[in-house]
Amino acid sequence: TLMGLLPTRGKLFYRGEDISAFTLEERVMMGIALVPEKRELFGTMTVEDNLELGGFRQMRMGNRQWRSRIDDVYDLFPRLKERRTQLSGTLSGGERQMLAVGRSLMSNPDVLMLDEPSLGLAPLIVKEIFSIIETLRKTGVTIVLVEQNARAALAVADYGYVLEMGEVSLHGPAAELAQDSRVIDTYLGAARKD
């Protein structure tokens, strides 16, 4: 809905401007990037070709150095550099997730939306993905994270919202939500530390 892929109800504001009627391309050009749950890579294209597609915004803005962002992505995800000529359809689930995030970062976004980045990944890869999310957060990129792994999400978040049946049931600073008995009992499944 935020990226204009589904019909919306209500209004969507970004930097004080109602962008509800904006096209997907207009939202991308404003600096909003999405990593969808299903990753949506081009499986018959190489890793590097997929990354180059992510440079659309920078290219349209006339940034002649947009290709240098590929090196930034490879610094963040060294495994992708090793597989730069490999078809993305042959990558593991964790590598595909890294590529999807890397492709979004090619646009140099102000806001990065991640939809279920840990879905279907091995625990070790989930830890690696969330470490990268934390690194990105520290660089000043605003991250909007939709995640079923509440513990991992709250560990990297500044602020959180708990949705039940599509409605906000709780919200607040992530550290407070992580200690809230309702969140612990329902989503974290562990005794609260007082």
Q: What is each residue range found by the language model?
A:
Residues 1-194:
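Glycine-rich phosphate-binding loops of nucleotide-dependent enzymes
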